[in-house]
Amino acid sequence: IPGSQGSLDVLTERDIKFVEFAAHNDIDYLGLSFVREASDVVKLRELLHSHGNTTARIISKIEKPQAVNNIDAIIEVSDGIMVARGDLGIEISNEKVPIVQKTIIRKANTKRKVVIVATQMLDSMIENPIPTRAETSDVANAILDGTDAIMLSGETAAGAYPVEAVAMMKKIADNVEESPFMRKNKFPRKMIEEEKDSQAMAIGMSIADMARKMNVKAVIALTGSGFTASMLAEGKLNIPIFACCPSKNICRDIKLYRGVFPYIVDFDASIDKESLKQMDEFLMKSMKLEDGDLVLVTGSVPELLVGGTNFIKIHEIGKLKRQENAQK
């Protein structure tokens, strides 16, 4: 019933069995439906931990008015947020959904949490090969709001044009990201205010400034926990963030962040000469960068510390090797 508080447990017996299966099968993300308060998320995390899984991430689906009222606390304990507009529109009325969507995206961005906008994005493409103009604008505005991901549901699950729907969504996203209206190389103001004394935030803002002013092709984030890459993602950089991670779990964790392309690396994540030469080979082979390209390298030294981002290096790919060859 729309607007009702409801007293049912957020996890049914069937859900608990699914969670047990997920915990033992290396699942990256679980979506928790009909979250009402932070304790619902905590309960799911404790259940995962009871099965020995401490790596699966939780996406809280915001579908109830109670969740909207408790959004700050829910964001704090979640790994990501999904604005599930279908049920949310029934619960709080359609005209309120756009402002709620913008508010949630902004709050999630500020806290460096993945945010997904979903439901009825290209709904008419369930039956038609092209979307309505209103749907196109809806997808575009979600991207302009700052969402990390846009999601199809019925369009691909049961629609007559699933491939066309995905292609259309990508076409809209590409067009929006090239537009002058897209926030680029700029962190959310509230995030800057809340982290004004953060060393990592200062480095992130410097990288955003360099990305805007210099002809750099990418940021190389040497990250042990995913922190550096997730922080940079909120700056909406106009260049890709190639995250070099020590494990597949970290890579998979951060893949949902906007503009982040994670890779498992087998070289030392440091900035000594030999490591940089290894990195150059990797960048040209795996990331399609070229000899002579400028990139920004960031991370923490002397070792990969969680949240310890403490350096930026302007690096020219191939320069070290060329210098060595010239000295022979």
Q: How would you describe each model-predicted region?
A:
Residues 1-328:
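Non-catalytic helical/linker scaffolds that mediate oligomerization, partner binding
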